[in-house]
Amino acid sequence: MRIALIAHDKKKDLMIQFTKDHEDYLSNHTLYATGTTGTRIMEHTKLKVNLKKSGPLGGDQEIGSMIANGKLDLVFFFRDPLTAQPHEPDVSALLRLCDVYDVPLATNNAAADLFIKHLKGK
């Protein structure tokens, strides 16, 4: 499975904990992430992550392109809904593409945990 990992700044620590908690499962899949998120994940885990640009520098658009081209199967995007993002149009476009192309999307830790638990059960 091809999985994207994205987290806004205030959610990066939560994403790192999520990847630590599910490292065994995630290590069996191809992972992609925006630059800063992916770098931090690799610093704190043994996971191999294919890096895109940082979100505000076009990374969200790169992930969106992967969705539109059928190159992603699942997106974990830990969003910070309480902080305005300078690249909010890119974020909205990425979320829209998940809906258009029917790619499962978890935008918080609880949903992401449920996805992993379900996938492990298969």
Curated annotation (Swiss-Prot):
Signal peptide region: none
PANTHER family in the record: METHYLGLYOXAL SYNTHASE
BP GO annotations: methylglyoxal biosynthetic process
Annotated SMART domains: MGS
Pfam families: MGS (PF02142)
Lineage: Bacteria, Bacillati, Mycoplasmatota, Mollicutes, Acholeplasmatales
Gene Ontology molecular-function annotations: methylglyoxal synthase activity
UniProt xrefs under NCBIfam families: MGSA, PRK05234.1
Homology family: Belongs to the methylglyoxal synthase family.
Domain MGS-like: from-to ranges: 1-122
Active site positions: 60 (proton donor/acceptor)
Alphabetical UniProt keywords: Lyase
Catalyzed reactions per annotation: dihydroxyacetone phosphate = methylglyoxal + phosphate
Name of this protein: Methylglyoxal synthase
Designated gene of the protein: mgsA
E.C. numbers: 4.2.3.3
Its biological purpose: Catalyzes the formation of methylglyoxal from dihydroxyacetone phosphate.
